């Protein structure tokens, strides 16, 4: 009797169920197998991992190959600066989105986007215009990425593909470009300076905006100190 009721319920809603099935299949396959098919630099290192030589990538960017290892300092800095609820959401942060909507409406212009780190990874991989429609697509893809990858992997994808000013892409390339050392060897101050760059990569420019960069870095360091990081 119970089975017959379920069968009747499904029969009455067969088109809705079919549509839901199609949407689920589309959702499952919506994420590309390779998020970043972009070319990378040829990198030559010694036995200790120190850089001996590197060539620019075919697209003119200093983009080192993907590195699954992300220094703890950078992870703490970027989460504190970009997405403090990163470890607790599934790709989208309703609190951040609500705050962004209020700020934008109050200021009558785009002040905040409310994007999570996961959404930023998706945006970096797609390179599409920044508008509301694309933001909605990024949100859907971000939830799918959260099912497909660990939080550590998402941080690593961000660190390897975020822009760090000029034609420098990725944390490791930025570390060598600006400090001449591996990312693992950077101080908290140096790492904090790099962590604020992807949000405004134009901050790094010879003789321009250095004060703004230092202010953002110091604000991040103060936030980390107050959180006893």
What are these regions (language model features)?
Residues 2-229:
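Juxtamembrane regions of bacterial inner-membrane/periplasmic proteins
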